[in-house]
Amino acid sequence: MIENYTALDLETTGLNPKYDKIIEAGAVKVRNGEIIDRFQQLIRPGIALPEKITGLTGITQEELLEAKGSETVIPQLLDFLEDDVILGHSVMFDYSFLKKAAVNQNLWRPEQSHLGLDTLRLSRIYLPELPSRRLADLCLHYGIRHQAHRALGDAESTVQLYSVLRKEFCENALGEAASKQTREEREKTFAPFPLIYKIKRESPIRPQQKQKLYSLLEQHKIIPDYDVEKLTRNEASRIIDRIYFTYGR
């Protein structure tokens, strides 16, 4: 059984790693089944923070303006993760955002890969009768203290949830699904699996785009809620198109 891993949780501006950004990273390092270290950082995303995300997480635009940028935090997070197995609740969500940010900063090594453990996947297999398998609801079901929608709190709760699920279903074979499996089958279900997410590095904003965007911002007296210098080529194109649509050419 896996006793050494790092639990990861990311808060983001939305659900799509292609367009959205990380605003908070939380990670918990586990060795021999015990938490030995923690990582938590807000991240300045360089784009506007949707109001619904503030309502969900309690994180404000003002806090993020004071936070470190992705170019500082992502290298620190990768160092913390090392080559560990990554535990998450819907682990591919967090892994996809992490890898996109790392690839765009040329931080992802060609040979780099991780195995993953997913408490959402396990709960779907062993707790099909529950009306919801969101992390908050599973924590309520098992009496686990939980600070919802903050990265470190979610990561810590995921560690506790994984421990409970492993003991209840893998070790003790409780419940209908587990009772129908052999010990070997249960251990295989709880074994880490390869995390595979393919992404290409996005090109940075072109000088012509930068010049055009600064000109449009000045012309229409727009105060940007993003960092022009850190935009990708695609992001700059979408913003320029949006300005043209709003103000005309």
Question: Predicted regions span which residues?
Answer:
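Acidic two-metal-ion nuclease catalytic site recognized across multiple nuclease folds
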Residues: 161-249
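Acidic, divalent-metal-coordinating active-site segment for phosphoryl/phosphodiester hydrolysis
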Residues: 152-163
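Nuclease catalytic cores that cleave nucleic-acid phosphodiester bonds
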Residues: 125
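Short secondary-structure boundary/hinge segments and terminal tails
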Residues: 72, 156-157, 235
